UniProtKB/Swiss-Prot annotation:
Pfam families: GAF, HATPase_c, HisKA, PAS, PAS_2, PHY. The keyword Transcription regulation applies. Belongs to the phytochrome family. InterPro entries: GAF, GAF-like_dom_sf, HATPase_C_sf, His_kinase_dom, HisK_dim/P_dom, PAS, PAS-like_dom_sf, PAS_2. It comes from Pisum sativum (Garden pea). This is Phytochrome A. The keyword Transcription applies. Residues 1-19 have a biased composition (Low complexity).
């Protein structure tokens, strides 16, 4: 679907467009499915995809009915695959409420004979499941019934009472019942007995290790590695990685296949090939297996007394739909295994350490798909391993996406800077006449500038006459917008789109002025698509009616032949930024030719100045380092100690005077020399290592205590030219904790004396047995987390104790959960982990950051019986020292210098303007001229005062001093209105001043400049929120209250009423301090409200039908005279 939208973009608009696209695509999926069901064997795939792609508005009611029926069909299917059987239970009674037709035969019969009574229980509606399995199996199932997160227990190994056959019971909960899939354990399998996450890691350990060892920066390498590892792990004939594009169509981006199979790498297919409903199911059930697409499905029989239909969406056995089976058969794929790749939604905000904030929203990035030309069954443990591997893969995909965005943003910013530099020399023609040009800003095939009725063309663009038609069409049909973007000019309604289709079909355009426009163009998507599919033999011919990859590719090209690659939000943000730069450049050109080149050069070449301020910061840093309660030392580029604070002198017994001048390597233990040498060399190259452990020698009376163990962060010290001149080491003393861990290592068996010791030196320790159940939780963990020992013991450590949902200690996100699982599983296999960053939310919602070390636990025979986990917490002093280190970064200083420089440069021309106004005041002016000069003077005073606001925190916290003077409301109103008249005239908005004359002329006492600043801000925001041609009304009321004999307190209330839908909710939330200050409007509103608070006032915002109002209140004093 084409999207025509203003050239601004936001998270909310992105999400709403995404939702609208999904709804529309689901409607198309439903129609296509209905056509397939009606047509049967005569179904024509290619024509159906083309027809369903165009949704007629008149058919919408019918589409809704079709969609509802389709979704109900998807969710309420009543068939399963025959490789296993299914039971649905009433949780309260353990009785069967639904079963698959093959369940009695698989679970209760020794042979195909009719079941007998006694030892061979019959299975049907109302059967108690505990009578079907052996006592231990029945007990395990009984325990699962009361388990909150029942899926954490999967798979449960059970044995039939009748035959003794082993099955994996895979359980999930749906509304009203518990559904259990039973998959037979094959004779060649070693039955899985531990929790799925622990055992499955062993199967996928090699693949996970290889993924984690890959260098970042290449999505192609990551995907190629993933399909290679899955190919080796599962043994399928073909493994592919699918990626879903923004318009939901798919692409095969990586593939590995056995010789002789047709390659699908590079294949694109329409969005309808994988319907939205199927994608939703992949988000819920992340691994899906089809054993044999030709197998006959088995019906599920349900108790007729149940008041609802069971849904099998979460079942591992759920039967695929006939449409999908036919597609598989047509491409000679008999069996498949599909893994969902779920990543963070880029439209969402980042993670927060606040416990009350929701988790990041997820989206289906793509799929890892395995195909086989013969039936293939993959046991559940291996499928679980694949799911775990897919989660690790998704984490790395997420990182690659973030890295790609960072690189793109960096390139865009670099291009914007260069374009801005060109504008300083030649605005606006520099963006098309020099290099780089506007085509380098975003990916496009052509661009054009329409300026002062002349055209400049770059790359593939429409002709000049066609461009003039587009500009005329925009002026007629998009008058209210500052621009638009579309991936299809035809869908956007441009009459001449058909004549352009061979050249371009997507366009982004923004206005510099009402008549000047910048264009970017894209050709149709099909022009960029190449698929190196297998060549046809002479005489072969495709049957486009069949559902097949070749038909999909052909159908995709048909769908996108008049559509370009969509414009991404970050691309539109870059375009909009350039638009603002061009607008400002245009205004500057029309008003005055300032020497902007000199200013820009000065800004770009700006170095850190103001040595006094730098020296003050340095002195404060030195004082903090010397008095810090954590050990801190520093060395120069040669490794010679030039900093040695009181704490490290106390720990080592080496005074400051003796330490200074010694080489660092002579002060550390021999076993730590290589570690320190590597850390020092990396830091001198600018690579600052964190959480490195080494041991340092002791001296004097401290020698008998042995060496000091430190956890150290390196921080490179740099001069003004960014050259590394030394290294500072901020450390934490962990000698006591290391002593405990060493003692633990030496003790074999009797660990409880340490683990359960209440001594404060004992670090937080917890553990798990070999099956994944929490078996240790010491006093330090109770204090740290707020969870008692009895509340966590015998719960699943992964999922119940530490998890992302409904767990005791909530982890920040899915990535943290997966990484924690990897660390635990590595230790279970003998690979111990030391000091990895770890974090979780305590019972009270506080986020705890620490270092995690994991060691295996062994019995007398040397067998691994579980793992121990040790936490090391950073001391408050260390956290403070690191915080100070971050605050002293040179980036912050540079920004401060840039801001100081710009404010200084503004003051000089402002002083000239003030001087000119003063000169005018001394001349013989008429009354109206004097009024205009006075208004200008008030605006200049307001600007000067704002430039003095160097401490916004002071305003926000209420520490600003007000300048009190006599004034009239009339003066404030005139000055405030003058600041918004240009904007109101541009939009054709009438400003009605309904303030009564006696109120306007009342002499008041207060800070008039701050009042006019606030009033101008609220007027501007009201005008921006008012539709073109609307009206803004300002009114006032005034009440007096006598304080003593001579002073009157004035309560002034100003109302600004405007039409339209109102100020955006996000800006209002920022005004009241409910959200992080992000937008310019939000910051302005927030500061204005704080200024009102300083004047003992506040602001309210009222919404009514068709209009909204700001109500501003302030307290002032009244004088005794009226000004005429």
């Amino acid at each position: 679907m084409s999207t025509t939208r203003p050239s601004q973009s936001s998270n909310n608009s992105g999400r709403s467009r995404n939702s609208a696209r999904i709804i529309a695509q689901t409607t198309v999926d439903a129609k296509l499915h209905a056509t397939f069901e009606e047509s049967g064997s005569s179904f024509d795939y290619s024509s159906s995809v083309r027809v369903s792609g165009s949704v007629d508005g008149d058919q919408q009611p019918r589409s809704n009915k079709v969609t509802t029926a389709y979704l109900n069909h998807i969710q309420r299917g009543k068939q399963i695959q025959p490789f296993g059987c299914l039971l649905a239970l009433d949780e309260k009674t353990c009785k069967v409420v639904a079963y698959s037709e093959n369940a009695p035969e698989m679970l209760t019969m020794v042979s195909h004979a009719v079941p007998s009574v006694g030892d061979h229980p019959a299975l049907g509606i109302g059967t108690d499941i505990r009578t079907v399995f052996t006592a231990p199996s029945a007990s395990a199932l009984q325990k699962a019934l009361g388990f909150a997160e029942v899926s954490l227990l999967n798979p449960i190994l059970v044995h039939c009472k009748t035959s003794g056959k082993p099955f994996y019971a895979i359980i999930h909960r749906v509304t009203g019942s518990l559904i259990i899939d039973f998959e037979p354990v094959k004779p060649y399998e070693v039955p899985m007995t531990a929790a799925g996450a622990l055992q499955s890691y062993k199967l996928a350990a090699k693949a996970i290790t290889r993924l984690q060892s890959l260098a970042s920066g290449s999505m192609e390498r990551l995907c190629d590695t993933m399909v290679q590892e899955v190919f080796e792990l599962t043994g399928y004939d073909r493994v592919m990685a699918y990626k879903f594009h923004e318009d939901d169509h798919g692409e095969v981006i990586a593939e590995i296949a056995k010789p002789g199979l047709e390659p699908y790498l590079g294949l694109h297919y329409p969005a309808t090939d994988i319907p939205q409903a199927a994608r939703f199911l992949f988000m819920k059930n992340k691994v899906r297996m089809i054993v044999d697409c030709n197998a006959k499905h088995v019906k599920v029989l349900q108790d007729e007394k149940l008041p609802f239909d069971l849904t099998l969406c979460g079942s591992t056995l759920r039967a695929p739909h006939s449409c999908h089976l036919q597609y598989m058969a047509n491409m000679d794929s008999i069996a498949s295994l599909v893994m969902a790749v779920v990543v963070n939604d880029s439209d969402e905000d980042g993670d927060s350490a606040d416990a009350v904030l929701p988790q990041k929203k997820k989206r289906l990035w793509g799929l890892v798909v395995c195909h086989n030309t013969t039936p293939r069954f993959v046991p559940f443990p291996l499928r679980y391993a694949c799911e775990f591997l897919a989660q690790v893969f998704a984490i790395h995909v997420n990182k690659e996406i973030e890295l790609e965005y960072q690189i793109l943003e960096k390139n865009i910013l670099r291009t914007q800077t260069l374009l801005c530099d060109m504008l300083m020399r030649d605005a606006p023609l520099g963006i098309v006449s020099q290099s780089p040009n506007i085509m380098d800003l975003v990916k496009c095939d052509g661009a054009a500038l329409f300026y002062r009725n002349k055209l400049w063309l770059l790359g593939a663009t429409p002709t000049e006459s066609q461009l003039r038609e587009i500009a005329l069409w925009m002026s007629e049909y998009h008058t209210d917008s500052t621009g638009l973007s579309t991936d299809s000019l035809s869908d956007a309604g441009f009459p001449g789109a058909l004549s352009l289709s061979d050249t371009v079909c997507g366009m982004a355009a923004v206005r510099i002025t009402s008549k000047d426009i910048v264009f970017w163009f894209r050709s149709h998507t099909a022009a960029e698509i190449r698929w190196g599919g297998a060549k046809h033999e002479p005489g072969d011919q495709d049957d486009g009616r069949k559902m097949h990859p070749r038909s999909s590719f052909k159908a995709f090209l048909e769908v996108v032949k008049a559509r370009s690659v969509p414009w991404k939000d970050f691309e539109m943000d870059a375009i909009h930024s350039l638009q603002l730069i061009l607008r400002n450049a245009s205004k500057d050109t029309d008003i005055i030719d300032l020497n902007t080149k000199a200013i820009n050069t000065r800004l770009n070449d700006l170095k850190i100045e103001g040595m006094q301020e730098l020296e003050a910061v340095t002195s404060e840093m030195v004082r903090l380092i010397e008095t810090a309660t954590v050990p801190i030392l520093a060395v120069d580029v040669d490794g010679t100690v030039n900093g040695w604070n009181i704490k490290i002198a106390e720990l080592t017994g080496l005074p400051v005077g003796e330490a200074i001048g010694k080489h660092l390597l002579t002060l550390v233990e021999d076993s730590s020399t290589d570690i320190v040498k590597k850390m020092l060399n990396l830091a001198l190259q600018g690579e600052e290592e964190k959480n490195v452990q080494f041991e340092i020698k002791t001296h004097g009376d401290q020698v008998e205590s042995g060496p000091i163990s430190l956890i150290v962060n390196a921080c490179a010290s740099k001069d003004l030219r960014e050259n590394v001149v030394g290294v500072c080491f901020v450390a934490q003393d962990i000698t006591a904790q290391k002593t405990v861990m060493d003692k633990f290592t030496r003790i074999e068996g009797d660990y409880k004396a340490i683990v359960q010791n209440p001594n404060q030196l004992i670090p937080p320790i917890f553990g798990t047995d070999e099956f994944g159940w929490c078996c240790e939780w010491n006093a330090a963990m109770i204090k740290l987390t707020g969870w008692k020992r009895e509340e966590v013991m015998d719960k699943m450590l992964l999922g119940e104790v530490f998890g992302t949902q409904m767990s005791c200690c909530r982890l920040k996100n899915q990535e943290a959960f997966v990484n924690f699982g990897i660390v635990l599983n590595k230790a279970m296999t003998g690979l111990e982990t030391e000091k990895v960053p770890f974090g979780f939310f305590s019972r009270k919602g506080k986020y705890v950051e620490c270092l995690l070390s994991v060691s295996k636990k062994i019995d007398a025979e040397g067998l691994v019986t579980g793992v121990f986990c040790f936490l090391q917490l950073a001391s408050p002093e260390l956290q403070q020292a690191l915080h100070i280190q971050r605050l002293s970064e040179q980036t912050a200083l540079k920004r401060l210098k840039v801001l100081t420089y710009m404010k200084r440069q503004i003051r000089n021309p402002l002083a000239g303007i003030v001087f000119s106004s003063k000169m005018l005041e001394g001349t013989d002016l008429e009354t109206e001229q004097k009024r205009i000069v006075n208004t200008s003077s008030q605006c200049q005073r307001q600007l000067s005062k704002i430039l003095d606001d160097s401490d916004l925190d002071g305003i926000i916290d209420g520490y600003l001093d007000l300048e009190m003077a006599e004034f009239t409301l009339h003066e404030v109103l005139v000055t405030s209105l003058s600041q918004v008249m240009n904007r109101s005239n541009t939009k054709g908005i009438r400003i009605a001043n309904d303030v009564a004359e006696h109120i306007a002329r009342e002499t008041l006492y207060g800070d008039s400049l701050r009042l006019q600043q606030v009033l101008a801000d609220f007027l501007l925001i009201s005008i921006n929120s008012t539709p073109n041609g609307g009206q803004v009304v300002i009114a006032a009321s005034l009440t007096k209250e006598q304080l003593g004999k001579s002073v009157h307190l004035v309560n002034l209330e100003l109302s600004i009423t405007h039409g339209g839908s109102g100020v955006p909710e996000a800006a209002l939330n920022q005004m009241f301090g409910n959200n992080v200050l992000e937008s310019e409007e939000g910051i302005s509103l927030h500061i204005s409200r704080k200024l009102l608070k300083l004047m003992n006032g506040d602001v309210r915002y009222l919404k009514e039908a068709g209009k909204s109002s700001f109500i501003l209140s302030v307290e002032l004093a009244a004088a005794h005279k009226l000004k005429g």
